Every structure is written in structure tokens, then in C-alpha cells.
Amino acid sequence: MPRQNRVTPFGTLEAVSARGTLMGNRGIMHDVNGVLGTARWQHPHWIACRLAFKGRWRPIMAARSWTELFFLDEAVAFAAGHRPCAECRREDYRRFLVAWRAARGLPASSKLLATDIDRALHKERVESRTRTQITLKANLPDLPYGTFVAIPPGRDAWVTIETDILRWTHAGYDRSRPMHAVDVEVLTPRSIVEVFRAGYRPKLHPSAEAGAATSSHPKGGRGLG
């Protein structure tokens, strides 16, 4: 039976059999039987890690160990509020720091601690009292590559890629639409959106990069807006 540890762009955790390409950590959220409690984080240091690193192996949801979470890809991890791990994804983390400094107008040589980034992100990704995701409003064409948005009806999650958007599922991206000028609900935290604007390009699942998504509108047909 699948465990409830697959993360959506809305930051929620679901039990599905689809595999992810990144693993996440928010602390210990499960009991000794591997069942999630009510907590959805235990600390503000939310990271996204490689699935394999230096031959290390760990049982999933082991007793008294952090809860392994899984994301379809990096864009989903960012939408849920997770930054690159500074150990197993060192190069991605360094690129992230460069873009974070640029987005905030900081000197390239300025000292930047992961704890400072995590503190800033935690204020933007979730309401601590209600545990609901914090979202923004923006015009769709103004958003950079890799930003997740919610589109009605149904409030499906879509990711921006150049002039199109792709619909997310746990298994991959299954549909594309041309981008139109329309106000949307942005799921990706504000600071992450600015990091994307500053040049960090998140890696998407092969279903997007290989062009596996199929168009929901014929060429020249009506898209959003």
C-alpha cells in the first residue's frame, strides 16, 4: 500500500504509487508504525534531496527518523516550499544562492546562511496557525519558467514553460495549454518566483522536457483567458 508521502504543488501529502525524482525532508511527521500524524512539519528547514547519494540507504518512515517525502520534480518541490539540499545537491544549492542574492539585490560576495533563507521561506509558504498554503495573484504571462499556478475549474495545478503551461499529475505532465493574459493563483512562494526571475531554472520531469504532454486545445484554438 502506498504511503502518504507524495507531495503536491499545493504542499499537501497524498498516498499514490507514482514515483518521484526528488526526496524531501520537513522533520519527523510519522509514528513508529509509519503513519502520519497531524503535523505537516517539525522545523522550517524544508529541503529537496537527490534520491541516491554516496550509496546511502535508509528504510522509508523508520521509527524516530525523519519522514521521507517525494516530489515529481524540482518545480513541484519549490512550489511546496522546499529548497535544494546543501549537501547532496551542492551545485544546485550554489546556483540557488546566486539567484537568491541577485533577486534581493545583495552583493555576490555577501554571506548568506541557509537558516536565513529557510526563515524567509517559511513566512511565505504556509500559514502557521491554519497550516494552509500561502498563495499570490499574478498575471500568467508575467510568471517565470517553472512557476506553479492553480487554474479553475477544479483548481488543477499547472506549471509555466515559456509560452505554455503544463498540467501536473503525480505521474507526470499530461496536458498543455497556450499561455494567455489572465490573473491566476500562484502556488510557488514569492521569493522562489523571484529566484526564477533572477535566472534559476528548475528541472522538470521528463514528461515535460520530452514533450510528452498533449495539447488540450487545437493549434490556434482558445486557451486560458
Indicate where each model-derived feature is located.
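Mature, structured domains enriched in cysteine- and short glycine motifs
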Residues: 1-213
